[in-house]
Each structure stands twice: as structure tokens, then as C-alpha cells.
């Protein structure tokens, strides 16, 4: 039997949250997980909502999604970032529950659209996003990596 999941927004950055990110982010990316200080900034930002999926049986955080909503000149836009579900909790609807809550909050905040990116290799995630109504865009995604040389001297 599948254990129930509850989705909650992070209210504050805690050691529990830092430990969850330390466990989850490596399952998504080679990026270093945020430390407690960085999580405090992320959670405190009025543009961000960090959603957490709790396994109610264990009380453990088993997934996360960050929703970013901001006004730009053309509209209020939303981005879903860093969706990750613990490998042990996959197949239980955790990613869907997180994404649906992110979409609900984006609509509640007046977003005209919600963007996300997902690597092609994440086949199950891509199927989920398409099933939820996301459509692939005919656009290029570019990344510029800021280096120390780009930053002004201290």
C-alpha cells in the first residue's frame, strides 16, 4: 500500500531541510546542495516558494520543487525549478503532487504561464509534465556561466 504524501511550503530553513537537500540534490544534479545559509536566502525570497513532499508514515522529506514567480515587463511569469523525488519514493505520485501544487500556486499568484526545463534523459518526468499540460517550446535554452572574471573586484 502506498503511504500518503503531504505537500507543504517551507516556512523556514532548518537543519532538517538542509539534510533533505543534501540527500536529494545529488539525485538531480552534479551541483552542490545549498547549505543552511543559502537555504535561508532561498526560503526568505518573496519570489520563491520551496515545496516539500513529506512521507506521512516516516515524516521524512521525500521530494522538493522550487517555484519562482515574478513580474517581468510582459507578464507575471513562473518557473518550476529543481524538481527532485528521492529514488526510494519514485512511482508514488510525489512528483505529480509537487508539480500540481506548484501550478496551483502559480495560478493563484497571477502567472500567465509556467516554464520548466527537463533533461531528455528524465523520461518519466517528461511524460509527467506533458500529461499535466506542459508543451515543448520551439526555443533555444542558453546558459552563460558566470566566472570570477565577470564579477567586480571586491
Regions of interest found by a model, annotated:
Residues 6, 113-115, 141:
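Residues at or immediately flanking beta-strands
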Residues 85, 91-104, 127-132:
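Conserved acetyl-CoA-binding loop-helix of GNAT-fold acetyltransferases
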Residues 3-76, 81, 86, 99-101, ...:
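Acetyl-CoA-dependent GNAT
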Residues 99, 106-118:
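Conserved GNAT acetyl-CoA-binding A-motif
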Residues 1-2, 153-154:
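Actinobacteria-biased recognition of intrinsically disordered, low-complexity terminal regions
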Residues 96, 120-146:
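Conserved active-site alpha-helix within GNAT-family acetyltransferase domains
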Residues 148-151:
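Short helix-loop capping/hinge motifs at secondary-structure junctions, enriched
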Amino acid at each position: 500500500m502506498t503511504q500518503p504524501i503531504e505537500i507543504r511550503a517551507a516556512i523556514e530553513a532548518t537543519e532538517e531541510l538542509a539534510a533533505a537537500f543534501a540527500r536529494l540534490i545529488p539525485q538531480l544534479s552534479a551541483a552542490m546542495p545549498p547549505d543552511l545559509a543559502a537555504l535561508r536566502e532561498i526560503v526568505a525570497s518573496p519570489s520563491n516558494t520551496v515545496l516539500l513532499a513529506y512521507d506521512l508514515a516516516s515524516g521524512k522529506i521525500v521530494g522538493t520543487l522550487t517555484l519562482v514567480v515574478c513580474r517581468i515587463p510582459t507578464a507575471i511569469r513562473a518557473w518550476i525549478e529543481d524538481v527532485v523525488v528521492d529514488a526510494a519514493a519514485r512511482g508514488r505520485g510525489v512528483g505529480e503532487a509537487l508539480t500540481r501544487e506548484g501550478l496551483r500556486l502559480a495560478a493563484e499568484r497571477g502567472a500567465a504561464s509556467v516554464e520548466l526545463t527537463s533533461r531528455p534523459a528524465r523520461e518519466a518526468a517528461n511524460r509527467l509534465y506533458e500529461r499535466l499540460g506542459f508543451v515543448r517550446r520551439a526555443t533555444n535554452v542558453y546558459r552563460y556561466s558566470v566566472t570570477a572574471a565577470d564579477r567586480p573586484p571586491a
